[in-house]
């Protein structure tokens, strides 16, 4: 657990606090009102992963389509919940077998996810048959924690069968492409966990992608900084530029921010034995 705290929280804390302090010039409120109750509520809620309690800062991004300061952070509370669940999963895996338990979790999560997705399509919030699941209690239940376990268990199952799957690398590429096409044109997202798992496996094992770890691990930093960077650019009017220019500028700023976050914050809180640091040290030695 300590390793995960070191990996996740320092960068998370930095991004939340920096955003809260540095975005005040974009607020429509005076400084005295900005650094008031709303500011402290945002800090308090976001620093303990309860982003949904205070997703926005006072007067910030009010003209954007989504006023949330960092809408990407909502998944972190689910990730933390996964880590808290690991000891219990470990206990049952030791007792009944890892493959059995992970298979049960995967099936339960699929039933939850797709069961409520079906009900959301069948019933309007007022009980009238409808294909529009918006604001339905079923559509809200569909995306709660139990439905996210399907991705957690799928990752573990990929690891358990990794050696076997390596022998069928090309077949997995073909199956992944077929699943995506079927999901895109016929099932509208109901098979996403299958083709996404295939993509993760393919990219994780493909030797031709090179060893980017020698420069550091910027994936987490990219994830937690991209939203506020894009929101700021939109608020400043960059979205009115040519789409290609906007894309290049945004990618450059996000890359720069994630690289700085890794070298100034993330790597400094990791132990020297961490595989994230070892990967960089080995390739640079």
What is the predicted function of each stretch?
Residues 80-111, 159-171, 239-243:
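Solvent-exposed interhelical
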Residues 100-110, 170-180, 219-222, 250:
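Central hydrophobic cores of alpha-helical transmembrane segments
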Residues 269-285:
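Membrane-proximal cytoplasmic C-terminal regulatory module of class A 7TM GPCRs
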Residues 13, 17-21, 25, 84, ...:
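Generic alpha-helical transmembrane segments of integral inner-membrane proteins
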Residues 8-78, 194-199, 203:
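Membrane-interface helix-loop-helix regions
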Residues 65-78, 114-151, 162-167, 180-200, ...:
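Interfacial loop-to-helix transition and helix-capping segments at the boundaries
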Residues 21-26, 88-97, 156-165, 181-186, ...:
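Structural signal for the C-terminal ends of transmembrane alpha-helices
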Residues 177-267:
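Alpha-helical transmembrane segments of multi-pass integral membrane proteins
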């Amino acid at each position: 657990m300590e390793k995960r705290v070191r990996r996740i929280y320092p960068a998370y804390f930095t991004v939340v606090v920096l955003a809260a302090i540095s975005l005040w010039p974009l607020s429509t409120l005076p400084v005295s009102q900005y650094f008031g109750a709303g500011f402290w509520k945002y800090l308090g809620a976001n620093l303990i992963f309860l982003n949904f309690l205070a997703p926005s800062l006072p007067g910030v991004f009010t003209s954007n389509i989504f006023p949330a300061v960092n809408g990407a952070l909502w998944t972190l509370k689910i990730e933390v919940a996964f880590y808290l669940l690991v000891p219990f999963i470990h206990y049952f895996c030791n007792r009944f077998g890892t493959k059995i338990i992970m298979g049960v979790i995967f099936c339960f999560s699929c039933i939850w996810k797709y069961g409520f997705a079906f009900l959301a399509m069948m019933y309007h919030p007022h009980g009238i048959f409808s294909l529009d699941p918006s604001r339905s209690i079923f559509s809200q239940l569909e995306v709660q924690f139990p439905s996210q376990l399907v991705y957690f268990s799928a990752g573990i199952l990929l690891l358990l069968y990794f050696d076997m799957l390596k022998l069928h690398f090309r077949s997995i590429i073909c199956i992944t492409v077929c699943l995506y096409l079927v999901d895109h044109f016929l099932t509208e997202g109901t098979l996403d966990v299958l083709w996404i798992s295939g993509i993760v496996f393919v990219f994780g094992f493909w030797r031709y992608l090179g060893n980017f770890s020698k420069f550091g691990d910027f994936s987490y930093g990219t994830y937690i900084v991209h939203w506020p960077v894009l929101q700021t650019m939109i608020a400043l009017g960059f979205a009115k530029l040519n789409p290609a220019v906007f894309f290049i500028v945004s990618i450059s700023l996000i890359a720069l921010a994630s690289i700085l976050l890794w070298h100034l914050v993330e790597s400094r809180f990791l132990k020297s034995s961490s595989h994230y640091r070892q990967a960089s040290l080995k390739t640079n030695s």
